């Protein structure tokens, strides 16, 4: 007779795999400018020291073709005369040479500790990002020419940062982002917008090459379940600006937002468990209702 067949031991069910929480990008808006003057090397150094892995800044070209960092197209809001007095008359970057810009102080308005701070060049910022091992979020401003966009891309390449750079610009500057992906189909690009609608999605899709990450970078008031679904159906992730409240940040990430441009929130601020969708949407809607049209409309 055949020996009895030993029954196979029962298969232990594998424990359920916990879904990984997405890593949220916290982007230092114009550097960490709660500690140092915005868009200056001290602000970027403060951001890196605080733990930010992503630094945002705005690029303009001078009259003699030097790429410099400043949010506005004029320097009046952030610069002062060398003696600390306010600048009289509008000073537009595109009508000034780099040497002329060096005559102004970009730190003294924030306090004596920053006396003598000069406007940074794009080249030195990219070099800093490389040395600090952080990712630059490069906002293209002032309707640059294709040649100017290519100049910036060349500077990024020379710094060995082509694979790290993120390029962002508003919908009305879509052509500039198209210039970026035409020159480098693998470039990561984000389309800035105050809203999130079908037209925004259609514009962003023109930047998809099949080889790159394209995302929507929208004002936080544009986020709700429907707009997030619209983006997801197009294969677009969503990042937001400018969020300085932890509760709002938690609500936005619970709705699927993967990046937050901020003035104050440190990268360590995350939520262990996402909120219920209806709770998250209610919080976002409350903040949107209270939102007032300020300079935060434009990062």
Where are these regions (language model features)?
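Phosphate-group recognition and catalysis centered on beta-loop-alpha active-site segments
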Residues: 1-299
